[in-house]
From Swiss-Prot:
Pfam families: HisG
Family: Belongs to the ATP phosphoribosyltransferase family. Long subfamily.
Protein name per the record: ATP phosphoribosyltransferase
Coiled coil: none
EC number: 2.4.2.17
Name of the gene this protein is made from: hisG
Amino acid sequence: MSASTAAPARDRLRIAIQKNGRLAEPARSLLAACGLSWRQSRDKLFCYGESLPVDLLLVRDDDIPGLIADGVCDLGIVGQNELDEQASARRRAGLPAAYHAVRGVGFGQCRLMLAVPEEWGWQGVAQLAGKRIATSYPAILADWLERQGIDASVVELSGSVEIAPRLGTADLICDLVSSGATLAANQLKPVELVMESEAVLAGAVREPADARAALLAMLLRRMDGVLKLRDSKLLMFRAEQGNVDALRRLLPDADPLVQLPDDGNGALRLQTMCHGAVTWQRLEELERAGAQGLMVLTVERSLA
């Protein structure tokens, strides 16, 4: 289907995610936390939504932007780097991207970086002039080189980019880096950041106007609730009125304290949502400041 052809009307939402790879399991877990469940087809590429009319398509990550642009899928979970690469390539071909990042989903963080052989004495981007750079992200790299005013050759490779300098097919590389272990194993060192990336929920620029619109709104609301609470804990405790201000100062990353009905013991019953780590040391600080009966509870979902 071409980007200019209207997608047929349908009443089920369709989401594309990576079949295998580092984003596959976190993406499925996030969607499951939003209340979705599926029945998998025999070919294991299509998952029929059982709890809601929301189906999954399991594909290669580099297929996801095109599936959204062509109206085959409504949403996809994919790396921002892949989204930007294909958007840039489409612009260079005179085509609209037709999709955008709706929101980050809190996993898959990495960096697209230039890496050079360890023996290089790196002095800055001017050193790239006339060099050959191997990458799986030629459009992003070409855009970056243009912004830097550097004339260098882009060598496109679909995989094993890190061995290109050793094979003599490139002088340096531009590749995704998370821990840096792969670079070190190939006697390379990162020297220049091209872009920061993370997994995002991507969607079509033109949102569906049929029955899928309500499903989309509901799913996004649920996802917001899950993402907001992912690293949050509900903290409950009792305290005397005179200690409340000191306790509040120890909770800078928490929501405003909420007072619960009195339990007849004289102390205030309080609760708050903490959006940072609630460690033993932190609980002990709160106890020394006058908090009593401290409880830390996990919250799985919320509708704000």
